Protein backbone atom coordinates (compact mmCIF):
# COMPACT_ATOMS: atom_id res chain seq x y z
CA UNK A 1 0.00 0.00 0.00
CA UNK A 2 2.72 2.49 0.97
CA UNK A 3 4.79 1.45 -2.05
CA UNK A 4 1.84 2.05 -4.40
CA UNK A 5 1.14 5.37 -2.68
CA UNK A 6 4.73 6.55 -3.10
CA UNK A 7 4.86 5.38 -6.73
CA UNK A 8 1.62 7.15 -7.72
CA UNK A 9 2.59 10.31 -5.84
CA UNK A 10 6.06 10.36 -7.41
CA UNK A 11 4.62 9.87 -10.90
CA UNK A 12 2.13 12.69 -10.42
CA UNK A 13 4.81 15.02 -9.06
CA UNK A 14 7.18 14.32 -11.97
CA UNK A 15 4.46 14.84 -14.60
CA UNK A 16 3.17 18.02 -12.98
CA UNK A 17 6.65 19.48 -12.46
CA UNK A 18 7.49 18.74 -16.10
CA UNK A 19 4.42 20.62 -17.33
CA UNK A 20 5.08 23.51 -14.95
CA UNK A 21 8.70 23.71 -16.13
CA UNK A 22 7.59 23.68 -19.78
CA UNK A 23 5.08 26.42 -19.03
CA UNK A 24 7.85 28.47 -17.43
CA UNK A 25 10.64 27.94 -19.95
CA UNK A 26 8.87 27.06 -23.21
CA UNK A 27 5.32 28.53 -23.23
CA UNK A 28 3.33 27.24 -26.20
CA UNK A 29 3.03 29.89 -28.90
CA UNK A 30 4.76 32.21 -26.45
CA UNK A 31 1.63 32.35 -24.27
CA UNK A 32 2.01 31.43 -20.57
CA UNK A 33 -0.50 28.98 -19.15
CA UNK A 34 -1.30 26.93 -22.26
CA UNK A 35 0.64 23.88 -21.06
CA UNK A 36 -1.62 23.70 -18.01
CA UNK A 37 -4.96 23.51 -19.84
CA UNK A 38 -4.69 19.72 -20.22
CA UNK A 39 -4.04 18.87 -16.57
CA UNK A 40 -6.62 21.47 -15.51
CA UNK A 41 -9.35 19.69 -17.48
CA UNK A 42 -8.11 16.25 -16.46
CA UNK A 43 -8.22 16.98 -12.74
CA UNK A 44 -11.39 19.10 -12.86
CA UNK A 45 -13.44 16.66 -14.93
CA UNK A 46 -11.99 13.63 -13.13
CA UNK A 47 -12.97 15.12 -9.79
CA UNK A 48 -16.44 16.08 -11.04
CA UNK A 49 -16.99 12.59 -12.46
CA UNK A 50 -16.03 10.91 -9.19
CA UNK A 51 -18.21 13.30 -7.20
CA UNK A 52 -21.17 12.53 -9.48
CA UNK A 53 -20.57 8.80 -9.08
CA UNK A 54 -20.49 9.08 -5.28
CA UNK A 55 -23.68 11.15 -5.26
CA UNK A 56 -25.40 8.41 -7.27
CA UNK A 57 -24.05 5.78 -4.87
CA UNK A 58 -25.51 7.76 -1.96
CA UNK A 59 -28.98 7.47 -3.50
CA UNK A 60 -29.22 10.85 -5.23
CA UNK A 61 -30.42 11.41 -8.77
CA UNK A 62 -27.68 13.27 -10.60
CA UNK A 63 -27.30 15.13 -13.89
CA UNK A 64 -23.69 14.04 -14.33
CA UNK A 65 -23.40 15.26 -17.93
CA UNK A 66 -24.70 18.72 -17.04
CA UNK A 67 -22.41 18.93 -14.03
CA UNK A 68 -19.34 17.90 -16.02
CA UNK A 69 -20.11 20.23 -18.92
CA UNK A 70 -20.75 23.13 -16.55
CA UNK A 71 -17.50 22.40 -14.72
CA UNK A 72 -15.56 22.48 -17.99
CA UNK A 73 -17.21 25.77 -19.01
CA UNK A 74 -16.33 27.38 -15.69
CA UNK A 75 -12.75 26.10 -15.60
CA UNK A 76 -12.03 27.09 -19.21
CA UNK A 77 -13.74 30.49 -19.19
CA UNK A 78 -10.98 31.93 -17.02
CA UNK A 79 -8.62 31.02 -19.88
CA UNK A 80 -10.34 33.44 -22.28
CA UNK A 81 -7.54 36.04 -21.86
CA UNK A 82 -5.06 33.25 -22.71
CA UNK A 83 -7.04 32.20 -25.79
CA UNK A 84 -7.12 35.89 -26.77
CA UNK A 85 -3.33 35.95 -26.75
CA UNK A 86 -3.21 32.75 -28.82
CA UNK A 87 -5.07 34.64 -31.54
CA UNK A 88 -2.15 37.06 -31.73
CA UNK A 89 -3.63 39.97 -29.79
CA UNK A 90 -3.11 41.16 -26.23
CA UNK A 91 -6.12 40.91 -23.95
CA UNK A 92 -7.56 44.46 -23.70
CA UNK A 93 -6.63 46.03 -20.39
CA UNK A 94 -9.78 48.16 -20.43
CA UNK A 95 -12.15 45.19 -20.81
CA UNK A 96 -14.96 45.78 -18.26
CA UNK A 97 -14.95 42.10 -17.32
CA UNK A 98 -11.25 42.06 -16.59
CA UNK A 99 -10.19 38.52 -15.74
CA UNK A 100 -12.27 37.75 -12.66
CA UNK A 101 -15.47 38.79 -14.43
CA UNK A 102 -15.28 35.74 -16.68
CA UNK A 103 -15.73 33.55 -13.60
CA UNK A 104 -19.08 35.23 -12.90
CA UNK A 105 -20.22 34.95 -16.52
CA UNK A 106 -19.13 31.31 -16.75
CA UNK A 107 -20.76 30.38 -13.42
CA UNK A 108 -24.08 31.85 -14.52
CA UNK A 109 -23.78 30.12 -17.90
CA UNK A 110 -22.90 26.76 -16.35
CA UNK A 111 -25.85 26.88 -13.96
CA UNK A 112 -28.15 27.89 -16.81
CA UNK A 113 -26.96 24.86 -18.80
CA UNK A 114 -27.79 22.55 -15.90
CA UNK A 115 -31.25 24.12 -15.56
CA UNK A 116 -32.04 24.06 -19.31
CA UNK A 117 -31.17 20.36 -19.53
CA UNK A 118 -33.85 19.58 -16.97
CA UNK A 119 -36.38 21.88 -18.63
CA UNK A 120 -35.94 19.80 -21.77
CA UNK A 121 -36.03 16.45 -19.97
CA UNK A 122 -38.87 17.15 -17.51
CA UNK A 123 -41.32 14.26 -17.00
CA UNK A 124 -44.30 14.93 -14.74
CA UNK A 125 -44.59 11.22 -13.92
CA UNK A 126 -41.23 11.40 -12.11
CA UNK A 127 -41.94 14.30 -9.81
CA UNK A 128 -38.96 15.64 -7.90
CA UNK A 129 -36.34 14.11 -10.20
CA UNK A 130 -35.65 17.26 -12.22
CA UNK A 131 -35.26 19.42 -9.12
CA UNK A 132 -32.91 16.89 -7.54
CA UNK A 133 -30.81 16.77 -10.70
CA UNK A 134 -30.66 20.57 -10.88
CA UNK A 135 -29.44 20.72 -7.28
CA UNK A 136 -26.85 17.99 -7.78
CA UNK A 137 -25.59 19.47 -11.05
CA UNK A 138 -25.33 22.90 -9.47
CA UNK A 139 -23.41 21.45 -6.54
CA UNK A 140 -20.89 19.75 -8.85
CA UNK A 141 -20.33 22.95 -10.84
CA UNK A 142 -19.91 25.11 -7.74
CA UNK A 143 -17.84 22.68 -5.68
CA UNK A 144 -15.42 21.65 -8.44
CA UNK A 145 -15.57 24.32 -11.13
CA UNK A 146 -15.13 27.42 -8.96
CA UNK A 147 -11.96 26.29 -7.12
CA UNK A 148 -10.32 25.19 -10.36
CA UNK A 149 -11.19 28.55 -11.90
CA UNK A 150 -9.49 30.21 -8.92
CA UNK A 151 -6.35 28.13 -9.54
CA UNK A 152 -6.26 29.61 -13.04
CA UNK A 153 -6.67 33.08 -11.54
CA UNK A 154 -3.65 32.41 -9.30
CA UNK A 155 -1.66 31.40 -12.39
CA UNK A 156 -2.59 34.70 -14.03
CA UNK A 157 -1.56 36.94 -11.10
CA UNK A 158 1.14 39.54 -11.70
CA UNK A 159 3.83 38.86 -14.25
CA UNK A 160 3.72 35.38 -15.87
CA UNK A 161 6.64 34.00 -13.85
CA UNK A 162 5.23 35.37 -10.59
CA UNK A 163 1.81 33.82 -11.16
CA UNK A 164 3.35 30.46 -11.98
CA UNK A 165 5.56 30.61 -8.88
CA UNK A 166 2.52 31.50 -6.77
CA UNK A 167 0.57 28.53 -8.16
CA UNK A 168 3.47 26.15 -7.54
CA UNK A 169 3.79 27.51 -4.00
CA UNK A 170 0.09 26.97 -3.32
CA UNK A 171 0.26 23.36 -4.51
CA UNK A 172 3.50 22.62 -2.64
CA UNK A 173 2.29 24.16 0.62
CA UNK A 174 -1.12 22.45 0.52
CA UNK A 175 0.33 19.05 -0.31
CA UNK A 176 3.05 19.51 2.33
CA UNK A 177 0.23 19.91 4.84
CA UNK A 178 -1.30 16.64 3.59
CA UNK A 179 2.03 14.87 3.90
CA UNK A 180 2.84 16.32 7.32
CA UNK A 181 -0.59 15.41 8.66
CA UNK A 182 -0.41 11.86 7.29
CA UNK A 183 3.01 10.93 8.64
CA UNK A 184 2.72 12.83 11.93
CA UNK A 185 -0.59 11.11 12.55
CA UNK A 186 0.95 7.73 11.74
CA UNK A 187 3.87 8.31 14.11
CA UNK A 188 2.38 10.04 17.14
CA UNK A 189 -1.35 10.46 16.46
CA UNK A 190 -3.43 9.71 19.57
CA UNK A 191 -6.36 12.12 19.76
CA UNK A 192 -9.01 11.77 17.06
CA UNK A 193 -9.87 14.93 15.13
CA UNK A 194 -13.27 14.09 13.60
CA UNK A 195 -13.85 10.39 14.34
CA UNK A 196 -17.39 10.30 12.94
CA UNK A 197 -16.12 11.41 9.51
CA UNK A 198 -12.50 10.32 9.25
CA UNK A 199 -11.29 8.03 12.07
CA UNK A 200 -7.69 8.14 10.85
CA UNK A 201 -7.22 11.88 11.29
CA UNK A 202 -5.78 13.15 14.58
CA UNK A 203 -5.10 16.49 16.26
CA UNK A 204 -1.40 15.64 16.30
CA UNK A 205 -1.51 15.03 12.56
CA UNK A 206 -3.32 18.31 11.97
CA UNK A 207 -0.68 20.24 13.92
CA UNK A 208 2.10 18.43 12.07
CA UNK A 209 0.47 19.34 8.77
CA UNK A 210 0.18 23.00 9.73
CA UNK A 211 3.80 23.11 10.87
CA UNK A 212 5.14 21.56 7.67
CA UNK A 213 2.91 23.82 5.57
CA UNK A 214 4.32 26.95 7.26
CA UNK A 215 7.86 25.67 6.71
CA UNK A 216 7.13 24.92 3.05
CA UNK A 217 5.53 28.34 2.68
CA UNK A 218 8.64 30.04 4.07
CA UNK A 219 10.92 28.10 1.71
CA UNK A 220 8.72 28.97 -1.29
CA UNK A 221 8.49 32.65 -0.41
CA UNK A 222 12.21 33.19 0.27
CA UNK A 223 13.54 30.72 -2.30
CA UNK A 224 11.21 29.65 -5.11
CA UNK A 225 9.34 32.89 -5.86
CA UNK A 226 12.45 35.16 -5.82
CA UNK A 227 14.34 32.65 -7.98
CA UNK A 228 11.57 32.43 -10.58
CA UNK A 229 10.05 35.89 -10.61
CA UNK A 230 12.29 38.55 -8.98
CA UNK A 231 9.40 40.19 -7.08
CA UNK A 232 9.42 43.96 -6.55
CA UNK A 233 8.56 43.58 -2.86
CA UNK A 234 9.53 40.57 -0.70
CA UNK A 235 7.07 38.57 1.35
CA UNK A 236 6.28 40.18 4.73
CA UNK A 237 7.20 38.37 7.95
CA UNK A 238 3.61 37.30 8.49
CA UNK A 239 3.25 36.00 4.93
CA UNK A 240 4.55 32.42 5.26
CA UNK A 241 2.73 31.91 8.57
CA UNK A 242 -0.65 33.08 7.27
CA UNK A 243 -0.31 31.39 3.88
CA UNK A 244 0.86 28.09 5.35
CA UNK A 245 -1.86 28.16 7.99
CA UNK A 246 -4.77 28.87 5.64
CA UNK A 247 -3.59 26.34 3.04
CA UNK A 248 -3.28 23.66 5.73
CA UNK A 249 -6.51 24.51 7.55
CA UNK A 250 -8.76 24.82 4.52
CA UNK A 251 -6.99 21.92 2.83
CA UNK A 252 -8.16 19.80 5.78
CA UNK A 253 -11.67 21.20 5.33
CA UNK A 254 -11.56 20.08 1.70
CA UNK A 255 -10.36 16.65 2.79
CA UNK A 256 -13.12 16.30 5.38
CA UNK A 257 -15.72 17.51 2.87
CA UNK A 258 -14.78 14.62 0.61
CA UNK A 259 -14.90 12.26 3.60
CA UNK A 260 -18.49 13.34 4.26
CA UNK A 261 -19.56 12.50 0.71
CA UNK A 262 -17.71 9.18 0.81
CA UNK A 263 -19.40 8.32 4.12
CA UNK A 264 -22.79 9.05 2.59
CA UNK A 265 -21.92 6.82 -0.37
CA UNK A 266 -20.36 4.05 1.74
CA UNK A 267 -17.07 4.33 -0.15
CA UNK A 268 -13.49 4.26 1.13
CA UNK A 269 -11.96 6.09 -1.85
CA UNK A 270 -13.40 8.33 -4.54
CA UNK A 271 -12.11 5.97 -7.22
CA UNK A 272 -9.35 3.58 -8.24
CA UNK A 273 -7.54 5.68 -10.80
CA UNK A 274 -4.33 6.09 -8.77
CA UNK A 275 -3.04 2.97 -6.96
CA UNK A 276 -2.31 3.71 -3.32
CA UNK A 277 -3.91 7.15 -3.49
CA UNK A 278 -7.44 6.26 -4.59
CA UNK A 279 -9.21 8.47 -7.09
CA UNK A 280 -8.51 11.86 -8.61
CA UNK A 281 -10.66 13.59 -6.00
CA UNK A 282 -8.51 11.99 -3.29
CA UNK A 283 -5.66 14.07 -4.75
CA UNK A 284 -7.54 17.31 -5.45
CA UNK A 285 -9.66 17.43 -2.26
CA UNK A 286 -7.29 19.64 -0.27
CA UNK A 287 -6.51 21.87 -3.27
CA UNK A 288 -10.23 22.48 -3.75
CA UNK A 289 -10.58 23.53 -0.12
CA UNK A 290 -7.46 25.72 -0.09
CA UNK A 291 -7.88 27.46 -3.47
CA UNK A 292 -9.96 30.47 -2.43
CA UNK A 293 -8.23 31.22 0.93
CA UNK A 294 -4.82 30.90 -0.75
CA UNK A 295 -5.87 33.28 -3.53
CA UNK A 296 -7.15 35.82 -1.00
CA UNK A 297 -3.91 35.55 1.00
CA UNK A 298 -1.89 36.17 -2.16
CA UNK A 299 -4.06 39.16 -3.05
CA UNK A 300 -3.42 40.49 0.46
CA UNK A 301 0.33 40.40 -0.22
CA UNK A 302 1.33 37.29 1.74
CA UNK A 303 3.94 36.42 -0.90
CA UNK A 304 4.96 39.96 -1.78
CA UNK A 305 4.43 41.23 -5.30
Q: Which positions does each model-derived feature cover?
A:
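Hydrophobic alpha-helical transmembrane segments that constitute the membrane-spanning cores
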Residues: 216, 220, 292-298
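Transmembrane alpha-helix interface/packing and boundary motifs in multi-pass membrane proteins
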Residues: 246-251, 275
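Interfacial loop-to-transmembrane junctions
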Residues: 264-287
Amino acid sequence: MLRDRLFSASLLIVLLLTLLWLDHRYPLAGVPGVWLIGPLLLFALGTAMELARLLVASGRRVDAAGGLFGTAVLALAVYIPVFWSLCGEDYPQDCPLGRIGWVVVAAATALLIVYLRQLAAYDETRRGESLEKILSGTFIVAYVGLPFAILVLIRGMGQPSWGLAALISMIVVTKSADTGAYYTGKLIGRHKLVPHLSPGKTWEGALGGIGLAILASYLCFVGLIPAMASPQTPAPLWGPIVFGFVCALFGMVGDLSESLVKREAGAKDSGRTLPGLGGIWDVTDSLIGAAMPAWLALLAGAAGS
